[in-house]
Amino acid sequence: MPFSNETEMSQCSNAKRRVNDPLTGPKNCSTSSTDSGVILNDNVAAFRPEKETKDRGTGEGQFQSKSEEKTESKRISVEHTVNITTENVGKTSSPAVSIRSTTISVVSIDDNAIDSSSIDSDSEAEAEDYTVQKLGHQVTYPPNSSHLRDLNQGLTVISRHVAPGEAAVPPPNPLEAGIVAKQILNGNLAVATPTSPAGGATQGIGSIALTNSTDVTFGDKHFYEGPVTIQQFLIDNRDKWKPGEGPAGGQDNPAFNGGPSTNGSAPGSKHEDPAQTPPICPFLPNTVGRKAVTVTVVFVTLTFLLGIVLATTTNLFGKTLNQSKIRDDDDYRQNIPINSTIDLDNIGGGLILRFVERQQWLAQPPQKEIPDLELPVGLVIALPTNSENCSTQAICVLRVRLLQTYDIESSQKCDIAYNFLIGGDGNVYVGRGWNKMGAHMNNINYDSQSLSFAYIGSFKTIQPSAKQLSVTRLLLERGVKLGKIAPSYRFTASSKLMPSVTDFKADALYASFANWTHWS
């Protein structure tokens, strides 16, 4: 029984047609096929027992089938050939497979059966119940049932491949996917993907032999009423359909991006994900609190380093000034800074022995070498300077400098005449010191055997301050302790040694030492 299948839907002028054989009566064989996710084709085969007939389809790439029937046993043999073609695609894409008429349904071969093609067309015969077989189970509905309209949601393309460099086809309007589509997308339904044979050779499904059978269907049989809609989906293992929240119980689309877009974005640009946006400086933290802490730590560190640099610079500058050479000319002495404790008084109130060294009161260097003193000495001489009194260190420094200038320039001495000077502020100003011979008596016999304690001021009628008397005791004890003064020393007045010298007159000063142990 030769017949011809329509290969393309667009080439079938009438998918449902009537075939009448005047010799054998209303015997027909109608076939329907399911597409492998690509195109639906309806095929019709006309049964003629004596001569071969050919379907009037005009489509390109028709499939031809041949069958033979023995009239003695009324056996029908149907052969159907399926051509599978592989389109040329890139190496990186999957092959696109187009399958035409993969199954054949034989509706009726009985002589008394109703012509199904007449039922499908505009005939006057009554149609029997519709049989719908879907995914392994069969459900029967009466004609014009409302369930048939609900089932006809159109064909769904479940496999789509786009070659690299090929323009993407815009998706159709979003529609509610059927139950089968959801199962396929969620991975609950396994879909067999047909593979193309090697070498492009055609394959057949074999031969079918029927004997004394009525209303036999091979494969799926589908009835479509209304327009056919093709939907495109991408199949993977992820759950594409998730139940939505709320009373409606709708479906959420996980690919939807509901974030606000930034004004001025380029057309077609995607919303930037803050978690995926690389930071400008990866080594820096992202939170505001950490940034504040980082800035604070950096600021404190820089401030600390700056303080160290300033302290080091100031210390070096101070040492340079202190180690500068003091010259004897007046122009240089005017520019010598006072960077010591020159403005500080004796905070001990005379109870602490405090020396003001030559460098601190800005003494001139000696004009020549001064002879050494034979130590320990047994004589300590007290005498006045016959200058104005002083009660602060600043004034006392001025008095000492003036005395040195007078002794060097007027008296033609090599240095200030006294070993030590005691001021009203309670400080001891170092003159020639412990080891050098003084010029206080202008007599070599006394000067070479004694130390001189000069009291700044005139004490003919004014007594020395309590600070001056207190530091005098401390100075004598320090000399004995250092081995500069003999333990059995004699403490006396210059006027007693040279009564004729009027400059040594200081009765109020000498009277202050009248009850001292070593005074004589």
Curated annotation (Swiss-Prot):
Residues in compartment: Cytoplasmic: 1-291
Cysteine pairings via disulfide bonds: 390-396
Keywords: Disulfide bond, Glycoprotein, Immunity, Innate immunity, Membrane, Signal-anchor, Transmembrane, Transmembrane helix
Extracellular compartment residues: 313-520
Annotated GO biological process: antibacterial humoral response; defense response to Gram-negative bacterium; defense response to virus; immune response; innate immune response; peptidoglycan recognition protein signaling pathway; positive regulation of antibacterial peptide biosynthetic process; positive regulation of biosynthetic process of antibacterial peptides active against Gram-negative bacteria
Main location as per UniProt: membrane
Chain ranges of the N-acetylmuramoyl-L-alanine amidase domain: 412-490
Maturation and modification: Proteolytically cleaved, probably by a metaloprotease such as Mmp2; proteolytic cleavage leads to activation of the imd/Relish signaling pathway.
Pfam families associated with the record: Amidase_2
Region span, Disordered: 1-78, 239-278
GO molecular function: lipopolysaccharide immune receptor activity; peptidoglycan binding; peptidoglycan immune receptor activity; zinc ion binding
Basic and acidic residues biased stretches: 48-58, 66-78
Tissue specificity comment: Expressed in the fat body and hemocytes.
One Gene Ontology cellular component annotation held by this UniProt entry: plasma membrane
Family: Belongs to the N-acetylmuramoyl-L-alanine amidase 2 family.
Name of the protein described by the UniProt record: Peptidoglycan-recognition protein LC
Gene: PGRP-LC
